[in-house]
């Protein structure tokens, strides 16, 4: 796609002097001459009305300057070398379809267990916020616009699934105190989405049970959790009734499922998302302390509830304390009554 991102040269490059303004127009693929090792991917840059080709591995010669949310996320993709990654791995359309089917299966289980919190006003509020963050056009082809669903779960969680559904837990809405904190956490999920962290992670999670077998086991776990709960409480319980309990939530919101869908991001990916969002908050004229404030409140929830699994080395929030510390000093955001009213569940 056409990009048209403004920038300047950070150092002398061929006949172009350091500090020269330019426009990154697009990225193209060249035919590779026989015996030539130079990259076939080149950035087309316009300097003083003249086009200059820059191999993608030399793109760091440019300082790209975002003007809005779309150019910000496009720069994030280019700086992360995603285009070269796709050149080596391919776009993996088959795997993406498989991940979308995995996510569809997951949502069916959530629906069956009655774990969706249906509130049109809250969903509309969250959807509008997501649309204000996500780019209108990416530097690499991605289709569809993510849709928000609210999950009945006391734990603060937010997950972007492979079928472009953003799950936001009721626990996340109550753990945070302001719109800017929610904006920051949602921007982190958009960062994972834009940088394709889930597909990259799935490629690393090679050992995978067959889809039907995996989700069958998940469904069995939900039924077992439900029936154990009801047998303990009612003498005349008839097996087969689905009833939402904390055990059911744990059966459907856990690290095994996150791993299955490539959402067990590496510590490097988590820190990368943190860093990107801090810069994004500045560009969008938001309080960048909101990011650290939100992560700190999420961490407090898991520490308070002594959630050993979530805080373990391989858990979803295992690196949170260290990440919060590395993000530096911050001022926790106060309660925003308007936000609390909009997200009251």
Set out the residue ranges of the language-model regions.
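Zn2+-dependent metallopeptidase catalytic core
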Residues: 119-141
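Conserved beta-strand/loop element in small beta-rich adapter and peptidoglycan-binding domains
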Residues: 13-32
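Catalytic zinc-binding patch centered on the HExxH motif and its immediate surroundings
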Residues: 149-167
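C-terminal capping/extension segments of zinc metalloprotease domains
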Residues: 1, 37-39, 44-46, 51-116, ...
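Catalytic Zn2+-binding segment of zinc metalloproteases
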Residues: 172-173, 177-181, 189-208, 286
